[in-house]
UniProtKB/Swiss-Prot annotation:
Keywords: Cytoplasm, Nucleus, Phosphoprotein
Pfam family, one: Iml2-TPR_39
Organism: Pyricularia oryzae (strain 70-15 / ATCC MYA-4617 / FGSC 8958)
Presence of keyword Phosphoprotein: yes
Chain intervals for the UniProt region annotation (Disordered): 1-32, 190-218, 232-257, 271-310
Compartment annotation: Cytoplasm; Nucleus
Protein name: Inclusion body clearance protein IML2
Gene that encodes the chain: IML2
Family membership noted in the UniProt record: Belongs to the IML2 family.
Length: 804
């Protein structure tokens, strides 16, 4: 079995080992009175701790922590398990008190594991078949504790703690490097492949055996067939296709689609009553909407069962398996995270020795995910979070055509849909009660532009036992509601986020206000500019104003239409007041959370935005809601790359909320059109939607006009300084569309390669321009997308032999 922790840590100095050997841990239940060797005790401790930790990933941390706290003198493994449980709650919820508890618990683990490491290194070499050097199991626990404490330190609001975190990170990497070197030595001695090779070979037509002896449960791991029920402790084999397609594939596309659809359809949402105490039970509540076959990968073999001839098959001893899966999970997560750091910060990290490697990190995480233990579960969660979360923001990804023609058999490029669906299926079977996997399942549908089905699934999930998981699911629902243009659900979801999570109330209030602003504008425009009767309902004529338009009405001439008008005006008044209240409340809650002693970028964005609107309202003598220019909800769609999730119908509808006549004051429109940053916000939002609708030429015309603005006109004061950088980024996306879409290539086949080369170079130049842009509020948000784009462009250029 095994446990987890990708990147975290604690104290700033190496714990001093105790003068004498550490005390023997209290024997686990069932072995009292039995004399056990040190090796047997260690195995018992590991097994007991891992059994408890399985509950964490099944949405039941209370059971896990209750079990782990039973030990009067807990082992390093039990302390690590307890630390992981509290740590996960702290990073999922960003709650200060939970972070403090996590820091204390992880510090205890750090000290104990160091002492056990020193003690273990003094022991005689093990004679029970272990391959790793003595003490390695405690060294990896120590490294995991350092990594966890490093993450918690970074999340604290102190710059000093953040600097300590980097020191812990260096220590953890040094420990992991030594363990990795030992693993490499073992691989060479045993004549196996590199320990850092691809853990999943390309699927073949022959299926491997699905049953392993208990003592071999960690070797030759594969995923079982989709219709088999899997225990969380059972050996589960995993093989995936190496990428979305392979150049030597002979399978038919229809087979791929049918296989993947069947696997996703096989996923079911268990009833909570059936999964509260039984991790392995997969109770059925409802069928999951299937994914469209039209989004299936290019021709290539679907994920099948076969021997995953990875280096992991070499390790059969539980302690070795724990170390092997942990080092892959920890090192892999570090490599992946460091590879996604925005360019400016990555250069700084490189100076002090922190360099990421996305390809290496992903390979290591896939290798760890093959193991049915806590390390494998964490690796799986990281992989799915990366592909369905972070990669969902990326625009510059290799086309399926280029992957099929250029990728190596063991190369993971872009979004490996088949792998992810298979991994998700296994995790759902292994941990049927966990809301995390259900949320990932909904993300798959949302990524297929099936927002309605994804939203329905998120709503079916209900509240998880871990409040932090509920918060994550609710946030995903809230963002999806923005893209679905469902203003009531968008409002209610973000208001609920205030109750569930205290990371950024300013952002939650602001976006909830955006929803009610759109509802106010909807009501005003459905009225056609009409207003309501007098509030006291008197029979006399009253002239009332809605936006710019005044109407006269009398109570005695009410008919069905008048009743509807009255209802709409009542709604307009209500939503206008609510929107203004939420917008004004947002800045008052900003600044409560800081990252490395800096205010959260989105909170700075919110404060500037509201201040700008207030200034305009005062200057024009308007109410706040009437002084707002281009739709802030449309701006949120852009900042979350919502166009990538929306189908053509939703994109066309979203275009309407950007129309100038949606503003409720003509004076506001006239004023806004004089402000370059506001005009640019309107134009970039429109261009992004046009790009996703396949209307790139129209988008390019808008963006070229915006790019001609002087940067100085969009800087200073409360102006939105990110918008010109984003316009340049959008131009890069249009160039990439030209690279990847055959319908945009020259009709003369001889000219295609040169056309693609030039467009690739153009995309790279534009991305480099954005990467080197001066600091702006949302630079980190765009930085990750830019870094992913640069990596993709370099990959294609290298494969094609082009010089950038």
């Amino acid at each position: 079995m095994s446990l987890r922790s990708w990147f975290r840590g604690s104290g700033t100095t190496t714990p001093k080992s105790s003068a004498g050997p550490s005390r023997a841990t209290t024997p686990p239940s069932g072995v009292q009175g039995t004399v056990m060797t040190a090796e047997q005790q260690e195995l018992a401790d590991l097994s007991d701790a891992m059994q408890a930790m399985a509950h964490i990933m099944n949405d039941d941390p209370e059971s896990a922590e209750a079990h782990l706290r039973q030990r009067k003198d807990p082992s390093s493994f039990h302390l690590l398990g307890l630390g992981v449980s509290i740590f996960m709650r702290s990073i999922l919820g960003f709650e200060k008190d939970v972070m403090a508890e996590a820091s204390k618990c992880i510090a205890d683990c750090e000290t104990r594991s160091w002492n056990d490491k020193v003690k273990g290194e003094r022991r005689e070499p093990a004679t029970d078949g272990r391959l790793f050097p003595n003490g390695s199991e405690f060294a990896i626990v120590y490294a995991q504790a350092l990594l966890m404490n490093a993450v918690v330190s970074v999340l604290h609001e102190s710059l000093t703690d953040a600097l300590k975190a980097f020191y812990k990170l260096r220590k953890a990497m040094a420990v992991m490097s030594s363990i990795s070197a030992a693993e490499e030595k073992i691989m060479k001695e045993q004549g196996a492949s590199s320990a850092r090779g691809n853990p999943f070979e390309q699927a073949s037509t022959a299926s491997g055996s699905g049953n392993l002896a208990a003592e071999d449960e960690d070797s030759d791991l594969e995923f079982v067939d989709a219709d088999e029920k899997v225990s969380p402790e059972a050996p589960i084999h995993v093989t995936y296709d190496g990428h979305t397609s392979t150049k030597d594939s002979t399978s038919q596309p229809a087979t791929d689609a049918a296989t993947l659809e069947g696997k996703l359809q096989a996923l079911e949402i268990p009833d909570d009553s059936d999964t509260k105490s039984h991790l392995s039970k997969s109770a059925v509540e409802s069928q999951v909407p299937s994914l469209s076959a039209s989004r299936a990968p290019s021709p290539g073999p679907p994920p099948q069962l076969t021997d995953a001839a990875s280096d992991g098959s070499l390790f059969t001893h539980p302690i070795d398996i724990f170390i092997h899966s942990a080092i892959n999970m920890c090192y892999g997560s570090l490599m992946l995270v460091l590879s996604m750091v925005p360019p400016a910060f990555s250069r700084l990290l490189g100076i002090i020795g922190f360099r990421g490697d996305r390809d290496k990190g992903l390979h290591m995480l896939w290798q760890s995910a093959a193991h049915p233990n806590m390390n494998g579960a964490v690796a799986g969660l990281l992989l799915l979070g990366y592909y369905h979360g972070l990669l969902a923001f990326a625009d510059v990804l290799p086309s399926e055509r280029d992957v099929a023609e250029l990728a190596e058999p063991d190369e993971i490029v872009g979004y490996p849909r088949g792998r992810c669906i298979e991994l998700l299926r296994v995790m759902r079977e292994r941990y049927p009660a966990s809301g995390l996997w259900r949320m990932e399942q909904a993300r798959v549908l949302i990524g297929e532009k099936k927002l309605k089905e994804g939203i329905e699934m998120l709503e079916k999930c209900g509240d998880a036992k871990m409040r932090q998981v509920t918060a994550l699911s609710t946030f995903e629902l809230a963002v999806s509601s923005i893209c679905y243009l469902d203003w009531p659900r968008m409002h209610s979801s973000f208001v609920r986020m205030v109750e569930l999570n205290d990371w950024s109330h300013a952002l939650y209030y602001f976006i909830a206000g955006c929803a009610h602003l759109e509802m106010y504008r909807d009501a005003v425009h459905e009225l056609g500019g009409l207003s309501e009767l007098s509030e006291d309902g008197s029979e006399s004529e009253k002239e009332v104003k809605a936006g710019d338009v005044k109407v006269t009405a009398t109570k005695d001439r009410l008919d069905v239409e008048d009743i509807r008008k009255k209802e709409l005006i009542s709604n307009a008044r209500k939503y206008k007041k609510s929107a203004e209240t939420l917008f004004r409340k947002a800045p008052t809650t900003a600044g409560r959370k800081r990252f490395m002693a800096r205010q959260m970028p989105f909170e700075v964005f919110v404060m500037r935005k509201v201040a700008k609107w207030e200034e305009r309202a005062t200057a024009l003598k308007l109410d706040l809601a009437d002084a707002i220019g281009p739709s802030p909800a449309a701006e949120m769609i852009y900042l979350w790359n919502g166009g990538k999730r929306m189908n053509l119908e939703l994109i066309e509808k979203a275009m309407t909320i950007l129309e100038w006549d949606r503003c409720t004051s003509s004076a506001t429109v006239a004023k806004v059109k004089e402000e370059h940053d506001e005009v640019a916000i309107h134009g970039v939002g429109q261009a992004a939607l046009l790009r996703h609708a396949g209307r790139g030429d129209e988008a390019k015309g808008i963006l070229l006009d915006i790019s001609a603005y002087d940067r100085a006109t969009c800087k200073g004061g409360n102006k939105d300084d990110y918008i010109l950088a984003s316009a340049t980024y959008e131009l890069a996306m249009l160039a990439w569309d030209d690279v990847c879409r055959p319908e945009r290539w020259p009709t003369d086949a001889d000219e295609v390669e040169e056309f693609r080369r030039k467009k690739t170079e153009e995309c790279y130049t534009l991305l480099e321009t954005v990467a080197k842009w001066e600091t702006y509020v949302l630079d980190a948000r765009f930085g990750m997308r830019v870094q992913t784009g640069l990596d993709t462009v370099r990959w294609l250029s290298k494969k094609k032999g082009w010089t950038l």
